[in-house]
Amino acid sequence: MVCRSCGLIQMNAMNFNNDKQNNPIISLCCENIPNIPQISFEGTAEEILYKFVNKCAKVDSECRNIQNNSKRIFTKGCVNCSQFQPRTYNNDRLIHYINLSAYPSPCQCRCIYCEVQKNEPDITESVKLFDNIIAVLELALEQGLIAPDARWQISSGEIAIHPYRDRLMKILKGRNAIFYTNCMKFDEDVAQNLHDNPNSAINLSIDAGTPETWHKVKGFDNFDKITENLSRYFVNTTRPGQISLKYIIMPGINDTYEDFTSVVEIMKVLNVKHLTISRDIRNKYSMSEQDTIDLTGAAAFLFAILSKNNMTSDMFTYSPEERKLVVEQANEIIAKQLI
């Protein structure tokens, strides 16, 4: 069956997040667009889980049966997303993806593109929120709603200093997880999860190849410590790909030749052969024509350097048109031997 959908909807993705008013929600999407399928995170664990399952069923029915965009209710916002495309539709109604990105959660970084409050989080609020989140997760597991091979993504602040780290790691024991980390602190339990679960991984948004640019983007002068901790995680891996890196391109800030070539050298040391090329999503839907030219030009340069070093990349946050333009420009850069 072919119908308009996206990968996250088909996985019944459970994204613990915050809306624009900073209210906790569970959504089937993590795009920064209005009217995405979501529920408010209010009530008991039983009530919240019922609301989520019911929302998934309504979204599933709409994807299967509604072709006219003007008649959409639960996926009304999805039509503005580049990921919402005609595709073979298959949904077993189990949760195959859990993304824990709810706040307040502590993080040592001061990334210039991050909109999360830089102040210390309200511990009382954080405790109450994560008590409820863990109750929902434990109930979903107990009721068999989460697929055994589900992918867990932990991206709330920094897991190594999270107040609920121990309880989260207990849930994740023996499960496939990707830990979004700033690598400022090495975590033995995360390293053990990598060793025990070949499908687990860590992801660092490295965003720089030099100490100077790292300091500019992240707010800390500790790039050597970051690369040291990356190497320590690498020692605990059992297959290629368990160390994954992302590069958020910000034209005029971190798009120099030295940064791009240096990050490739770091990838070689860690046996990383793939890089996610990303963007500052705050202005994803409000960029000027010149902004788009600058972004795709920088992405093309990085893409070309990766290709020349037999490395691959993805550009999930770029539209199909932007990706096409990046590849065309990269091929031209390579053909003209500009790198």
Task: Specify the residue positions occupied by each region the protein language model found.
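Leucine-rich repeat
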Residues: Q67-K71, L129-A147, Y164-L172, D189-V190, N193-L194, ...
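Core AdoMet radical
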Residues: L94-P106, E115-N132, I146-H162, L172-D187, ...
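Conserved C-terminal portion of the radical SAM core fold
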Residues: A147-W152, I178, N199-N203, D224-I339
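Distinct, well-ordered alpha-helical segments
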Residues: P163-K170, D187-H195, D255-F260
